[in-house]
């Protein structure tokens, strides 16, 4: 039963880290990356479809993405979806493909993006700590119910704390890498 707490807490913390990584990947750094367009959905035959399902996004060069479109009839829909996204991108039709130049970032925009990422990191840390709190509450309830001993309670809480510390370090590492990436340009 304590193992179940470890497993569930670990799974929840992994989901939190994955969600934070996705948020960080969606922040534009001025360098071309196909992940930048992962949040774009295209209105295609009456339903919203992820861009990556109807096209292939590749890095053309350091500051340019190239979208190879599977169905030529969706070209204008894809261009419209990119223009309507909050990414400040201006796609250009180039034959059957779409070229997306990635503009450089201003100092003001970099500072703003760093604040946003730091805020997201803090929210992820809070979520991790809440998972720890819930796990510790369950462990304390087991102690009150005399299901486990005090020694087992302390060992379990230490293990949960170690897990929490590891995941918070992962958040900090992702944050520092993205900050460096933003300040590089």
Swiss-Prot record:
Protein name stated in the entry: Ribosome-recycling factor
Pfam families cross-referenced by the UniProt entry: RRF
Q: GO biological process: any one? A: cytoplasmic translational termination
Gene designation per UniProt? frr
Q: What's the family?
A: Belongs to the RRF family.
**Which cell locations does it reside in?**
Cytoplasm
Q: Which GO molecular function terms does the record list?
A: ribosomal large subunit binding
Identify the keywords attached in UniProt to this record, alphabetized: Cytoplasm, Protein biosynthesis
Coarse class of the primary localization is cytoplasm
Briefly, what is this protein's role? Responsible for the release of ribosomes from messenger RNA at the termination of protein biosynthesis. May increase the efficiency of translation by recycling ribosomes from one round of translation to another.
Q: Name one GO cellular component term.
A: cytosol
Question: NCBIfam families given for it?
Answer: frr (TIGR00496)
């Amino acid at each position: 039963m304590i193992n179940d707490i470890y497993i569930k807490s670990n799974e929840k913390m992994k989901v939190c880290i994955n969600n934070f990584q996705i948020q960080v990947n969606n922040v534009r750094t001025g360098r071309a990356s196909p992940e930048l367009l992962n949040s774009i959905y295209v209105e295609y035959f009456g339903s919203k479809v992820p861009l990556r399902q109807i096209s292939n996004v590749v890095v053309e060069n350091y500051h340019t993405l190239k979208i190879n479109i599977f169905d030529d009839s969706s070209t204008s829909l894809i261009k419209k979806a990119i223009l309507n996204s909050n990414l400040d991108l201006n796609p250009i039709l180039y034959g059957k493909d779409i070229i997306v130049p990635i503009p450089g970032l201003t100092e003001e925009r970099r500072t703003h993006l760093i604040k946003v990422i730091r805020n997201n990191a803090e929210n992820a840390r809070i979520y991790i700590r809440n998972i720890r709190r819930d796990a510790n509450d369950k462990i304390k309830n087991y102690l009150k119910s005399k299901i486990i001993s005090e020694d087992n309670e302390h060992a379990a809480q230490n293990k949960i704390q170690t897990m929490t510390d590891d995941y918070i370090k992962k958040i900090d590492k992702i944050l520092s890498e993205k900050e460096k990436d933003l300040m590089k340009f």
